[in-house]
Curated annotation (Swiss-Prot):
It is a single-pass membrane protein. May be a cell surface adhesion protein. One of its GO terms (cellular component) is membrane. This is Putative fasciclin-like arabinogalactan protein 20. Residues 199-246, 405-424 are annotated as: Disordered. The chain crosses the membrane at residues 46-66.
Length: 424
């Protein structure tokens, strides 16, 4: 009778199989070792995969938080809120909006900026809430509900009433109840105007029943627990100092910038006016720098969807750190002088063509558009294309930068950060 071949060794009989127990026992450990090694390898791969997924998700969450504001800026620019987009872009450097995981922004239109002027950083905080309010939530807020803002100890009040035709109203300002932008982190709503300052709301509430008092039993919207880091408060002027400038030296230069900005807004220079109004530094450092702004109209600035760093470059290329009136420019033009802009390494040549004053070949159309003791603004129908500074330029006008001469060389990499007065 033939012996059945071994399952594992078909060529060996049972006796031979017994005789090779040592060999089989020696090999019998190998599958277990391989299995153990395979399990360890699999566990290691799973652990590595887990950490990679966690790391990628963590980066993605951070990236989403950091890019939400940038995306919001672009959407604002494309949706008829260019002034608010520019303001948000620059104000973000001081307000550190990326520190907040959720935000709701109420954006006034460009017409509102022209009518009311550029808001201060303090006022900007009043347009921002550190909580996300989706459209359905906003529409269902009861009259008198409080909405927290980035402005410490001040909140917005829902003021819905029949006089607004059933539309959502906050601080007596009509707000669109459909968001312009909502990426799950940042929500933006358009508003007819800027929200009234807390002081005025407080005064109105004492004489009007349409706005509940702060002691109302109506619930308030809490600041979410995720909003744990409060952005630092910038050093800006208080509301009481925001007066129109006169010929005397002001307490701080924000007064002057704001007044000049309002004029430019009303004359069609919204982009330059926006940047000018955001120069919020005060005069406590003793910096007596005076400036001249050569302002092109909005239509002269190409492509409204250009990167905002390009807008910064355009602004800096149209500003010099000297107070130059129309008569001064005429004098320099006769001398063939060259002005150094605050865009380091770039300059503007002043010349005459008959009786027309040219800056790098661009005619000056609106001389002395705005002038006081610290700032002069001249208007142009075209952008001034600044030229790279040459090594030997002859007799040029020296521009001081906080008491130090402007650095030589071509401006290689443009920064979106604005220094003192945003000019260097």
């Amino acid at each position: 009778m033939n012996k059945k071949p071994s399952k594992y060794f078909p060529s060996l009989n049972r006796t031979d199989y017994k005789n090779c127990n040592f060999l089989c026992n020696g090999f019998s450990l190998k599958p277990n070792e391989k299995k153990s090694s395979k399990n360890a390898s699999m566990a290691s791969k799973l652990l590595t995969t887990f950490f990679l997924i966690f790391f990628v998700l963590d980066i993605d969450l951070v990236a989403t938080s950091m890019t939400s504001v940038s995306s919001a800026v672009e959407v604002l620019s494309d949706s008829g809120y260019l002034s608010m987009g520019l303001t948000l872009k620059l104000a973000n450097q001081d307000l550190n909006l990326e520190d907040w995981q959720e935000l709701t922004l109420f954006a006034p239109s460009d017409q509102s900026f022209s009518k009311f002027g550029q808001p201060s950083l303090l006022d900007m905080k009043y347009q921002l809430s550190p909580t996300r309010l989706p459209g359905e939530t906003l529409r269902n807020l009861p009259n008198g509900a409080k909405i927290p803002t980035l402005r410490s100890n001040y909140s917005l009040t829902v003021t819905n009433s029949s006089r607004f035709g059933g539309k959502t109203s906050i601080n007596n300002v009509v707000v669109q109840d459909s968001p312009v932008f909502d990426d799950g982190y940042v929500v933006i709503y358009g508003s007819d105007e800027f929200f009234t300052s807390p002081t005025k709301i407080s005064d109105d509430s004492s004489s009007s029943s349409s706005i509940p008092s702060t002691t109302s039993s109506t619930g308030s919207i809490p600041i979410p627990s995720s909003a744990t880091q409060t952005p630092p408060s910038p050093n800006i002027a208080s509301d009481s100092t925001r007066n129109l400038p006169n010929r005397s030296k002001p307490v701080n230069r924000f007064n002057i910038f704001e007044s000049a900005s309002r004029l430019l807004m009303s004359r069609g220079f919204v982009i330059i006016a926006t940047f000018l109004a955001l120069q919020l530094e005060d005069n406590t450092s003793g910096n007596d720098t005076k400036i001249t702004v050569f302002a092109p109209i909005d239509e002269a600035i190409p492509n409204p969807t250009t990167k905002f760093s390009d807008y910064v470059t355009i602004f800096r290329g149209h500003v010099v750190s000297q107070l130059l009136l129309w008569k001064d420019l005429q004098k320099f033009a006769k001398e063939g002088s060259i002005l150094q802009t605050v865009l380091k390494g770039y300059e503007i040549e002043i010349s005459l063509s008959g009786d027309i004053l040219l800056l790098n070949g661009v005619p000056l159309i609106y001389p002395d558009l705005y002038v006081n003791d610290w700032i002069a603004v001249h208007g142009f129908n075209q952008m001034i294309v600044t030229k790279e500074k040459q090594v030997d330029v002859g007799d040029s006008i020296t521009v001081l930068n906080n008491g130090e001469q402007e650095e030589e060389g071509v401006h290689g990499e443009y920064s979106s950060e604005l220094g003192d007065y945003g000019l260097h």
